Structures are given as structure tokens and as C-alpha cells.
């Protein structure tokens, strides 16, 4: 579906993406992960044809990215989605459906279905009066008005509460089940793990790890999850806000906590990726010089060097610019 070869993008000589190669198959959910400034948005915008590569090729099916015909098969959700504040959700979506020449009845059915699924209420409310989560849902519905084969979502759950985030992530999975290819970027490894088939981790414009999330974790370190249950579960500690915290090391254990909590008449209120673990994975990968990465050397050294440098364990200490900060 997508073939990226030797992709390089510079802004006035500044290398935002430096030689990316990856492929995404049809129906796959593909995550682009990395710290602020890693080059995720640049990569996604290049796939969407909104940015021209400085070097390299980006092919989407039979088209080059940027080909006008390709756009008809694409749904792009930018990180910040400015909406026309005076329009209602319905009129806004109808406006975009008209731009894509979608017949009225078909457009209404499609957008109402999407908004039902995302549980968006008040569809005739002004967009300017909607909450951030509601606006994000409208933006997601907009990305689907043309029934695209490929969806490119930049931080789809950015700034959303846990419940809305879950809707959005579950919905992303549903889209792939309906045969759509989804490429999305995120900071949160838990979000990525819950929906992505494969992932690339970027840092300073470079892909520094790739594979399924379990493959990456196995190779580069362990992530832990803090699961907040509404009832006591085995090994949990009560938190100040009346929840019960259990820290576990993998998704099977997260699922076991959820089942235990539900069996006890409660549920899971929130799940958080343990940040130091995430940073350990990142430091393990990104702290090594590129040459050492090639042959697997330098892994323990780089984390140790970061700590010896005076930083907290897992904290980056070398952010001389805006690149490479989680
Ligand atoms: N139009 C631009 N002009 C100059 N530099 C840019 C431009 N767009 C991005 N950059 C720089 O390129 C680098 C990569 O930016 P990009 O937005 O792709 O990163 P990102 O991984 O999406 O970051 P974030 O997580 O903060 O959104 C950053 O250092 C950024 O400052």
C-alpha cells in the first residue's frame, strides 16, 4: 500500500527526516512514534502529499504521494484541526462531502454513522461551542466523508480524556477491520500498543527501531503499565483519589487486572504507561550513536552515560535544541 524509500526532508538545511525507509501493507495499522521534534508530523505530511520530499520516493498504491487522484483515496487528520467555528457539525461535514462530490444521502448516512459510533451528541451545535473532544470527533468524521482507503492521523488522541481516547482508538481498530489502512503518530506507547500492528520509532529524524511493539520492547527494554481499578485487585494499593493501583509489565497482565476488577463488580478507570520505562526504551535506542545502533553495541553504555551525566534515571540531558524531548 505504502512504500517509502530514502525519504529525506530538510527545512532550510535543517534535517527533519533523514533517510526513512518503510512499507505499510493494506489493512494494517502502522504507528509512527517518537519524542517531540522527531519528525513524525513531517513524515505523515509527506505521506499525505502535503509536503514534498527533499529526496526519496513515497508511493501510495499506484500513485506518488501528492498526486491529486491519490488525495481522493486519503483521509488526513492533522494534529491541530482548525474547524469553521460558526458551522454546526452537520453543516461542516456536509460542506466537506460536497467538496468530494459525495451524493447527499450517502454523505448523511456515512457521517451520521461515524458520529453515532463516536457518540457525538449536539450535532447541530456551533463547532465554536464544542469541547476539544467533540471537535476531534468531528475532525475524525471529516477524514471519513470521502470513504478513503488510507487514513493518516497525526496524534489522533492528543489532549483527549481517557474515555474519549478509548473511543478514538477503538474506532481506529474498527476502521482497519473494515479494510482501511491507518498510519498514525503518537507519543503514548500504550495507545500505540493497543491498536498498532507495527511501529517505527523515530528520533531526530531517523528511524531508530521498527517492528511490532512486543518485538521492540523485547529488543530494547520493558514498559510497565499503571492500571487504576475502581475496586481492590490483588497486589493493588489504594490511591488518594479512591482508586486502586496495580503496576504490571505486559498487556496480558493489564487484561487480567481488568477481568479481575470486572469480576469484583468494578472496572478499570485508567491505564498509564510508566514514563521512566518508556524513556528507558527510548534512551536505550536513541542514546546510542547511529554506528553503534547498526551492530547493537552501546546499549547499556548510553543509558549509563545519561545517568552519570547528572540526569535522573531515564531523563534526557542533552536537549540542546527542541529535538529529542519526550
Ligand atoms: N516548517 C518548518 N520549518 C522549519 N522547521 C520545521 C518545520 N516543520 C518542522 N520543523 C522542524 O523539524 C523537526 C521535526 O518536526 P516534526 O513536526 O516533524 O516533529 P514531530 O515528531 O511531529 O514533533 P511533535 O511531537 O512535537 O509534533 C523539528 O525540529 C521541527 O522544529
Where are these regions (language model features)?
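Short, charged/small-residue-rich alpha-helical element at the C-terminal edge
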Residues: 215, 221-289
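Catalytic Walker B motif of ABC-type/P-loop ATPase nucleotide-binding domains
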Residues: 151-155
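Conserved catalytic motifs of ABC-family nucleotide-binding domains
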Residues: 147
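Conserved ABC ATPase "signature" region
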Residues: 94, 98, 105-122
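Conserved ABC transporter NBD signature motif
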Residues: 56-66, 70
Amino acid at each position: 500500500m505504502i512504500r517509502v524509500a530514502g525519504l529525506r526532508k530538510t527545512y532550510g538545511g535543517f534535517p527533519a527526516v533523514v533517510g526513512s525507509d518503510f512499507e505499510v501493507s493494506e489493512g494494517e495499522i502502522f504507528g509512527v512514534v517518537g519524542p517531540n521534534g522527531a519528525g513524525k508530523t513531517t513524515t505523515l505530511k509527506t505521506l499525505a502529499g502535503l509536503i514534498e520530499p527533499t529526496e526519496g520516493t513515497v508511493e501510495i498504491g499506484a500513485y506518488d504521494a501528492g498526486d491529486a487522484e491519490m488525495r481522493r483515496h486519503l483521509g488526513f487528520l492533522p494534529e491541530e484541526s482548525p474547524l469553521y467555528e460558526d458551522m454546526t457539525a452537520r453543516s461542516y461535514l456536509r460542506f466537506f462531502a460536497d467538496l468530494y462530490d459525495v451524493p447527499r444521502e450517502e454523505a448523511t448516512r456515512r457521517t451520521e454513522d461515524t458520529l453515532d459510533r463516536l457518540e457525538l451528541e449536539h450535532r447541530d451545535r456551533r463547532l465554536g461551542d464544542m469541547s476539544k473532544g467533540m471537535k476531534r470527533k468531528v475532525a475524525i468524521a471529516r477524514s471519513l466523508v470521502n470513504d478513503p482507503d488510507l487514513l493518516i492521523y497525526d496524534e489522533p488522541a492528543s489532549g483527549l480524556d481517557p474515555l474519549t481516547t478509548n473511543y478514538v482508538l477503538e474506532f481506529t481498530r474498527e476502521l482497519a477491520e473494515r479494510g482501511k489502512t491507518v498510519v498514525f503518530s503518537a507519543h503514548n506507547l500504550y495507545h500505540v500498543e493497543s491498536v498498532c500492528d507495527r511501529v517505527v520509532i523515530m528520533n531526530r529524524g531517523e528511524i531508530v527501531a521498527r517492528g511490532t511493539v512486543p518485538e521492540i520492547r523485547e529488543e530494547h527494554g520493558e514498559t510497565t503499565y499503571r492500571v487504576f481499578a475502581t475496586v481492590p485487585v490483588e497486589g493493588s494499593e489504594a490511591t488518594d483519589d479512591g482508586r486502586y493501583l496495580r503496576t504490571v509489565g505486559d498487556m496480558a497482565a493489564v487484561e487480567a487486572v481488568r477481568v479481575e476488577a470486572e469480576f469484583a463488580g468494578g472496572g478499570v478507570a485508567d491505564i498509564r504507561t510508566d514514563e521512566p520505562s518508556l524513556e528507558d526504551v527510548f534512551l536505550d535506542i536513541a542514546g546510542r550513536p547511529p554506528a553503534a545502533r547498526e551492530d547493537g553495541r552501546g546499549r547499556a553504555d548510553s543509558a549509563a552515560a545519561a545517568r552519570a551525566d547528572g540526569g535522573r534515571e531515564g531523563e534526557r540531558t542533552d536537549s540542546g535544541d527542541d529535538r529529542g524531548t519526550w
